[in-house]
Amino acid sequence: DMAVVGHLDSEDYIGAIAVATTIFNFIYWNFSFLRMGTSGFTAQAFGAQDKQEQANSLLRSLVIALSAGTLIVLLQSFILRLGFFFFDAGDAVKIYAAEYFRIYIYAAPAILGMYTFNGWFIGMQDAKTPMFIAIGINIVNIGLCLFFVYVMKMNIEGVALASLCAQYLGFFSALTVWFNKYKSVNKYIKFSELKDIPAFRIFFKVNSNIFIRTIALVAVTTFFVSVSTREGDDILAVNALLMQLFILFSYFMDGFAYSAEALTGRYIGAKQKELLKILVKRLFRWGIAIAVLFT
């Protein structure tokens, strides 16, 4: 999105994407526990070879994701007003940001749903499926972005629409893969399990620490963009590009996080404590090495 709007006739588009994306990040990143929590519970069920719990972990998380996504869509006006309260951007930036926000907000159920599916696939020791779906989402997003912006002349609205379409394509692709590839598990789906309130309590309790960690992380990135808006639209645009480099680095480290979630849960479920100890030590060594290298 940032690359496409960067070639339009105003830096205000870059600033608008930065502001709108920061608002979305503040919302969605706080739901990242859907992916991390789901992968952990699923990996433990995988290690214990408990297909019923593998199905239950997906169902619980997916219900939470779709419910939260729908609520976000319903509260979009309030969220947008609250978001603009923290950003002192120019009028043009706010107008473009609002146009982008009002279209892309409808992707909320698909985005949170993908958090759940990604976490579940990783917990099932299947990292390839999320990777291929992510590649597909980005290819479709780029193609539609170029078409809507340069052919249909829709500018920032075209960018938002392209992202919206790509997210739903990714969600339904994940649903299709799950239905066809994991038939031995999906037959254990029982909606009566949704009445198990204690299971939901455990899910939220375990993920409370992740939520606190995410709040701290999002607060830093939001503060960075908020301060940038006070320095003018040019500084906002430049800092928005710098933030993309920070996010790019985080993707490298996410590989270790995915491995940790999948393998740690698997070894805990299988009660293989020695392998768990070896895994934790190696993850810390590789994580520190990569961090030092990038620094």
For each predicted feature, which ranges?
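Short alpha-helical transmembrane segments in multi-pass integral membrane proteins
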Residues: 42-109, 151-208, 264-295
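Hydrophobic faces of transmembrane alpha-helices in multi-pass small-molecule transporters and flippases
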Residues: 101, 105, 128-135, 173-176, ...
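Transmembrane alpha-helix boundary and packing residues in multipass membrane permease domains
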Residues: 2-3, 40, 81-82, 119, ...
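Helix-terminus/linker motif at the lipid-water interface of multi-pass membrane proteins
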Residues: 1-15, 84-91, 147-154, 215-248, ...
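Small-residue-rich hydrophobic transmembrane alpha-helices
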Residues: 14-73, 111-130, 225, 238-295
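Membrane-water interface regions at transmembrane-helix termini and the short interhelical loops
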Residues: 117-125, 145-157
